[in-house]
Amino acid sequence: MERHLRVLFFVEGYTDIRFVVGLSSICRLVVAVPSRPYVESGLKQRLAQSSASVRVDEINGGRLGFQLRSFVYLWQRARDFDVILSQEALRGSLNANVIGSLQGVPVVMSMGSSPVESFRCRRIRGQINWAKAVLGETVIWTLLRINGRLAARCLGIGPYLRDVAARFCPRTQIGLHHGVDTDYFRPADHAERAELRRKLDLPVEKFMIFCSSRISHEKDSETVLKAAALARTRGLDAVLINLGGGYKEFLHLAGQLHLPEAGSWVLGRPAAHPMTELADYFRAADVLVQASLAEGLGFSPLEALACGTPVVATAVGGMAVQLKGYARLTPLRDPEAMAEQFLWVWANPDQARAQALQGREFVIREWNRQKAFVDLLRVLETVVRKDQFADKRKRNGN
C-alpha cells in the first residue's frame, strides 16, 4: 500500500502497539507521545522490536508539563502534516484542535471510552467526593463540546461510542481502532488447547477462566473474583488467571476479599505481547470474563470470540450493544449471575463454543484488522480532501 498521507498521531496517555503498527502501514507516520507512559507501557521496546516505519517524538513532563510542551510542539510542527489523528477527546485533543484550527490542519479524534461514564466510576468507588465529581464532570463536558465543534471528524470506536460522541460532535462515525487480527486470534481444538496450556505452564485439567482486564476504576475485578469463588463452591474446579501490568494488584485484591483458598486458584502473569503472545491465552481458556462498571467497547471479548472462546461479560455500555447474542451477558455487579454463567459454560461446552464461533463470524465481518485500517485511511483521506477543497475556495474568494 502506497503511504502518501503525512499523519501525526497525537497521544496524551497510553496507546497500543497494534494500532501504531497498523497506522504506520497506511501513512507516513509520526507519533507524539508522553515519555513516561511510552516507556512504562512497554511500547517503546515493542516498537523498537517491530518493523514499523514510524518516528516517535517523546514529550516530557507530568500532566501540566505535557500540556504546555505539547502545545508548543504542535504549534511548531502541525503544518508538517496533512492531518492530525488525536487519541481521545479531552485535554490532549484540545491542544490539537485549537492549533489545527489556527493553522489549517484538520484533526480527527478517535474515542475509545466514554469520558463521562468512566469518570463517574470514580465517584461510584468513593475515590472522589461530590464536589470533585461535579467539577470534574463539568470540565469533561466543556472539553468534549469544544473539541466536538473544532474537530474535522470524531471516530467513536464501535456503535455505542459513535452514539456517545455524536452528542458533542456532529461529524461522528464509527471507527474500529486496531480491529482484530482474525488469522492470529483463531480457534483451537481440545487437543491444541491442552498443548497450549502445557506450553504456558497452566493447569491442563482445570476449567480456565481468563481475565485480561487491568485494575482500574471502571473495571469490576471484585465481581469476577467473587463469581469465580461462588462457582467453585458449586463444583466447578476452576482457576482464574489475570494477565496484565496490574496482575499483582489483582492477586492482592483476591487476598483482600478473603476468598477461600484464593492462593491456589487465582493466578497472575505480566502482560503478554499482544501481537505475538496474547492469543495463546485466549485460545487456551475455557471462558473469557470481562466485568465493568462502564465500558466503551471491550476488545478482549471480541478477541476471545475470534478464538471461538466463550465470553461472559457485564451487559454495560458497548459490551451490551456489541456482544448480544454472542456472549453470556450478566447484570452490573452481580457475582451470582456471573457464577451461573460460568457453570452454564462448563455444563454446555459444545453449545457455548458454537455461540462463540457465531461471534467469530461477526468479528470477521465487522471488526477484522484489515477492514479497520482500510476504513481509517478512507476517513483520513476524505478529511484531507475536504480541507484542501475548502482552502482552495477560500483562496479563490468563493
Residue ranges of model-derived segments:
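N-terminal subdomain of nucleotide-sugar transferases
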Residues: 1-52, 398
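Membrane-proximal helix-turn-helix segments that form the acceptor-binding/catalytic region
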Residues: 75, 133-154
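Aromatic "clamp/platform" in nucleotide-sugar-dependent glycosyltransferases that forms part
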Residues: 89, 293
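Conserved donor-binding/catalytic core segment of Leloir-type glycosyltransferases
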Residues: 203-219, 225-228, 241
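Nucleotide-activated donor-binding/catalytic signature segment of Leloir-type glycosyltransferases, i.e.
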Residues: 251-272
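Short alpha-helical donor nucleotide-sugar binding micro-motif in glycosyltransferases
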Residues: 280-285
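Short hydrophobic beta-strand element within catalytic cores of glycosyltransferases
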Residues: 310-313
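Conserved acidic donor-binding segment of nucleotide-sugar-dependent glycosyltransferases
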Residues: 327-335, 344-349
